């Protein structure tokens, strides 16, 4: 029996589902295996992590962009169509995940049988439950020698409230149990519901930029139908476009005449900018537009800012072009030019979170062959002045110096940490050091614990995750989401060299930590900056008050070398002359900070973390 054609598929045979899993629990491998078993992928063209198209995705083993694949699967003589929507698993991309979940009716909760449930799995599971999806619990990697299937099955059953026997066991690597899983999807996931003759409404759950064809928009049709060559309207921007190509992905793009209720596919309109087709927006017919959008659209909001500067100043235009190109593929990326007296021309770039920042930087360096320096990541602070005005500070150099400051507000996040119970003490200690407020602590099983903390985002962006991993031998996992703002006692610490502030090294820190930050930074720069002909003071200051100082000793010539014996007044004359020369040099001399010193000092201030 041949598979139904796109555009004329009965919604009753469609099943839309996604896979929720923590990094490394085998989501992409399971997706590969499903593609092979349903015959969409033949053995010859199969490669590991078939759906992860970016090199970085394959190398790091993570999924950054969502993908959607249509697979036929026959049950009792009826060919069903399974649309698998592959979602990113990382906390930075939780908005993308929530949009992908909106496009589904069911979700596979995939858990590694050796490791058990992790924080991101749990966070995405809650998103799926909020979206009212049918959850199918699955244990993966049952072929591993270290798999503890029964224990983790009980854990999952306890969290989602099902019976242990309902937890399916598969091995994505060998293919064991995957056919049963496909049957279960057909049996359990509800068919999509929608009104076929209503005005079209389709949810955009991802958009990617293709160099040759412009933006490819992935959509899930909720009501009505979208047809080839008709005019469509984006409801959040009001922009109208013509559909140049429409089709499904199986697993390469297959053009079709249209898409109907419940179907998942792609559109190409010839638009060149991803910001024109925003994730979470609703697409409708321009001729007969829908009254109401599907709701839930949010504009992605950067949480973390960092300055990116080319090491070689002549690469600045290339960096601009590279960011322009990346933004075509990543609507959440925002940037504006900035200049630094120390680092020259560059950009202030806003990211969704730390992983997003790392990936963008790595893609700039790898795909565009740029050498970059990035300044320490900072968050957006709101400074309320006594005259009632508010200043948003994304860069320490924007911190107001004149006028009286009433209060400074900083973003906070609710963090969930899952860890083996033996590490509770060290995790609580870390969270307390980072100004956290404990919100709750629950045992998921006798030896796994869920710790909830409210933390300032600025305390997480540096190296919280690395510290957490090193304190728990890599077993703890972290998930966080924003929770508004709070007032805090924050100050701007300036680093002065020979009395001049170095803008790239300024930082906004909590008053309690300002002293240790200043001392550590001054000590670090003392090691890094080469000795000059004159004495150079390295100072850390809050406003006009110096809180720490180190002195880089001058290099001096031995002016007494030519005096054999001789009179003391002769020696004193030579020393006084040298001293006067050094003093004059200090007034006119400027200190050049070598680039290596910057890179080392900005390396997220490791020495400031010495416990």
Swiss-Prot record:
The keyword Ubl conjugation does not apply. Residues 12-193 form the tr-type G domain. This is Elongation factor 4. It is found in: Cell membrane. One of its GO terms (molecular function) is translation elongation factor activity. The gene is lepA. Keywords: Cell membrane, GTP-binding, Hydrolase, Membrane, Nucleotide-binding, Protein biosynthesis. Belongs to the TRAFAC class translation factor GTPase superfamily. Classic translation factor GTPase family. LepA subfamily. Its main location: membrane. It comes from Cutibacterium acnes (strain DSM 16379 / KPA171202) (Propionibacterium acnes). CDD domains: EF4_II, EF4_III, LepA, lepA_C. Required for accurate and efficient protein synthesis under certain stress conditions. May act as a fidelity factor of the translation reaction, by catalyzing a one-codon backward translocation of tRNAs on improperly translocated ribosomes. Back-translocation proceeds from a post-translocation (POST) complex to a pre-translocation (PRE) complex, thus giving elongation factor G a second chance to translocate the tRNAs correctly. Binds to ribosomes in a GTP-dependent manner. PANTHER family: TRANSLATION FACTOR GUF1 HOMOLOG, CHLOROPLASTIC, TRANSLATION FACTOR GUF1-RELATED. HAMAP family: LepA. GO terms for biological process: positive regulation of translation. The keyword Cell membrane applies. It catalyses: GTP + H2O = GDP + phosphate + H(+).
